[in-house]
C-alpha cells in the first residue's frame, strides 16, 4: 500500500483547518437551540476526525470513523430526533441550587486538572511520523493487540462512557407520563 506523505508546509495548515472544524463543530453541537442542527454539527465533527485520521495515514481508522460514527450513529441520532417529534420546551429560569454549584465546582476542578496534566506532559516535537512507525500500525491485528493490551484501561473507560451516554439518551427521550387526577 502506498502512503501519501505531505510536506510539513501543507500538513500543518490542513491540520489547523481540521482542528478549527472540530472546535467549531463542537461549539455548534452545544450552542444551537434546535437539536437537529446539533446532530448535523456532530456529523461535521465526526467527518473532521476522520480526515485527521487520513492525514495521519490511518486509512482503516478513517474508514471506521466514517462508517461507524457518520454512517451509523449520526444517522441514528437524526432518525431518533425525527421520530420522537418532541415539541420544543421553553427554559424556565430558576434559582441556582446546591447541585448547580456542586456541578460547577466539579467541572472547574476537572478542567483545572486537565490543564495541569497537559502543561506537565512532555510532548514530542511536531514532526511527521517516520515510515517505520507508520508501517507498524497498518495491520488491523496490531491495532486490536494494542487496544486489548496497552490501551485496555482507556478502551474500557470509553465503553463505560458510551454506556452512560446511552442510558442518558434513553432517559431524555423517554416520554414523561403525567398522572391523571
UniProtKB/Swiss-Prot annotation:
Q: Name one Pfam family in it.
A: Oxidored_q3
Entry keyword Isomerase: no
Give the Gene Ontology MF terms in alphabetical order. NADH dehydrogenase (ubiquinone) activity; quinone binding
Instruction: Spell out the InterPro entries in the cross-references.
Output: NADH_UbQ/plastoQ_OxRdtase_su6 (IPR001457), Nuo/plastoQ_OxRdtase_6_NuoJ (IPR042106)
According to its UniProt record, which reaction does this protein catalyse? a plastoquinone + NADH + (n+1) H(+)(in) = a plastoquinol + NAD(+) + n H(+)(out); a plastoquinone + NADPH + (n+1) H(+)(in) = a plastoquinol + NADP(+) + n H(+)(out)
Q: Sorted alphabetically, which keywords does the UniProt record give?
A: Chloroplast, Membrane, NAD, NADP, Plastid, Plastoquinone, Quinone, Thylakoid, Translocase, Transmembrane, Transmembrane helix, Transport
- This protein's GO CC annotations: chloroplast thylakoid membrane
The entry's localization annotation reads: Plastid, Chloroplast thylakoid membrane
**Main localization (coarse):** plastid
Membrane topology is:
Multi-pass membrane protein
> Where are the bilayer-spanning segments?
13-33, 35-55, 64-84, 98-118, 152-172
Q: What EC number(s) does its UniProt record assign?
A: 7.1.1.-
Q: Which domain of life is it from?
A: Eukaryota
Report the function annotation for this chain.
NDH shuttles electrons from NAD(P)H:plastoquinone, via FMN and iron-sulfur (Fe-S) centers, to quinones in the photosynthetic chain and possibly in a chloroplast respiratory chain. The immediate electron acceptor for the enzyme in this species is believed to be plastoquinone. Couples the redox reaction to proton translocation, and thus conserves the redox energy in a proton gradient.
Family under the similarity heading: Belongs to the complex I subunit 6 family.
> Self-association or partners: how does it assemble?
NDH is composed of at least 16 different subunits, 5 of which are encoded in the nucleus.
Q: What is this protein called?
A: NAD(P)H-quinone oxidoreductase subunit 6, chloroplastic
Amino acid at each position: 500500500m502506498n502512503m501519501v506523505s505531505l510536506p510539513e508546509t501543507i500538513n500543518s495548515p490542513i491540520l489547523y483547518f481540521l482542528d478549527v472544524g472540530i472546535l467549531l463543530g463542537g461549539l455548534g453541537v452545544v450552542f444551537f437551540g434546535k437539536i437537529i442542527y446539533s446532530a448535523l454539527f456532530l456529523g461535521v465533527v465526526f467527518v473532521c476526525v476522520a480526515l485527521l485520521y487520513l492525514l495521519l495515514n490511518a486509512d482503516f481508522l478513517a474508514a471506521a470513523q466514517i462508517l461507524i460514527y457518520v454512517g451509523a450513529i449520526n444517522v441514528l441520532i437524526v432518525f431518533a430526533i425525527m421520530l420522537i417529534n418532541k415539541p420544543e420546551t421553553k427554559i424556565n429560569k430558576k434559582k441556582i441550587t446546591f447541585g448547580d454549584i456542586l456541578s460547577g465546582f466539579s467541572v472547574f476542578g476537572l478542567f483545572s486538572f486537565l490543564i495541569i496534566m497537559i502543561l506537565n506532559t512532555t510532548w514530542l516535537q511536531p514532526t511527521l511520523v517516520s515510515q517505520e512507525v507508520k508501517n507498524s500500525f497498518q495491520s488491523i491485528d496490531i491495532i486490536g493487540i494494542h487496544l486489548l493490551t496497552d490501551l485496555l484501561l482507556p478502551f474500557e473507560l470509553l465503553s463505560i462512557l458510551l454506556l452512560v451516554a446511552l442510558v442518558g439518551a434513553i432517559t431524555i427521550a423517554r416520554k414523561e407520563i403525567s398522572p391523571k387526577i
